[in-house]
Design a protein with these regions (language model features):
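The conserved SAM/SAH-binding core of class I Rossmann-like methyltransferase domains
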Residues: 10, 86, 111
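Surface-exposed, flexible loop/turn segments at secondary-structure boundaries
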Residues: 15, 91, 116
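Phosphate- and divalent-cation-binding pockets in alpha/beta enzyme and binding domains
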Residues: 16-19, 62, 152
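C-terminal substrate-binding/catalytic core of Rossmann-like NAD(P)-dependent dehydrogenases/reductases
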Residues: 37-40, 44-45, 94-143
Length: 170
């Protein structure tokens, strides 16, 4: 859990999120005010401290709306809030009301190729991940498909916890 005291996971497949053993979940199939309320409820009494955002777009806007509440709960105990953007699967842009920036100690950061750690550290991480995979501690359920089936199976990963592997004939 990377030293986190409370972890909230957001996604469309709640069964997968709940299996992670997190403290709270947010259903990203919700929209508008319902999604904002879900993020507010999931924050708990300490609010959010670090947010790792893989999708950007409407879900991020809903989360940010919970920070625009003009009370001390959004200060994460005086430590501030860090929003780390890792991807933009839902949308490339968001609307960011200026009031969100003025009403709390929010830092917005990006994590991409320009933010990679030094090569020796990356090698250590890769070694640790491969060791976990070799012992079976890191598993991913997969389903194999022929390249000819790609049009039919393209969206399967959106509806299932099983990852598709496309077989390419040699």
């Amino acid at each position: 859990q990377a030293g986190a005291g409370r972890i909230v996971a957001a996604g469309r497949r709640l069964s997968v999120l709940e299996a992670l053993g997190v403290d709270a979940t947010v259903d990203l199939s919700l929209q508008g005010e319902a999604l904002t309320q879900a993020f507010a409820a999931a924050a708990g009494p300490g609010g959010y401290q670090v947010i790792v955002d893989y999708i950007w777009g409407p879900a991020t806007e809903a989360l940010l709306a919970t920070l625009n509440n003009h009370d001390l709960s959004s200060y994460a105990g005086g430590r501030g809030i860090r929003l780390v953007n890792v991807g933009s699967m839902a949308a490339p842009d968001i609307r960011l009301p200026a009031a969100v920036l003025r009403s709390n100690q929010l830092q917005i950061l990006g994590s991409g190729t320009g933010n990679f750690p030094p090569i020796p550290e990356m090698q250590r991480y890769a070694t640790e991940i491969l060791a976990l995979a070799a012992t079976g501690a890191l598993t991913i359920e997969t389903q194999e498909h022929a390249l000819a089936e790609i049009a039919e199976v393209w969206d399967l990963n959106k509806k299932s916890d099983v990852r598709s592997v496309i077989r390419i004939a040699r």
